[in-house]
């Protein structure tokens, strides 16, 4: 039984939480968040990139954008199963859709990817 954990973000910083846990060839993504830049016009700061096809499942611990804000990118060329509570999913969707409205064209995903997240 071999377990490897790759820290994608949140190490030495507040925000963009993400951990890729590999156990015997299965990849579980624990959170996949975003961190907003200090300057309003700068793009948000993303985690180390994970290819959607390399993720078997994702778990969102809670709805804050620093834990859920990048999850829709898993549906940009992929179709990952996402696990979380119903309230976490509902609030995550609301926050991510609001983020996309406010920060037009700054993200690698759009509302279609957010809707795919809902169906999974």
Give, region by region, the residue ranges found by the protein language model.
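Extreme N-terminal starter segment of soluble prokaryotic enzymes
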Residues: 1-6, 27
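Short Gly/Pro-enriched turn/cap motifs at secondary-structure boundaries
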Residues: 9-11
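Pre-active-site segment of Zn-dependent metallo-hydrolases
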Residues: 14-16, 23-60, 64-80, 95-120
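Short internal beta-strands
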Residues: 80-89
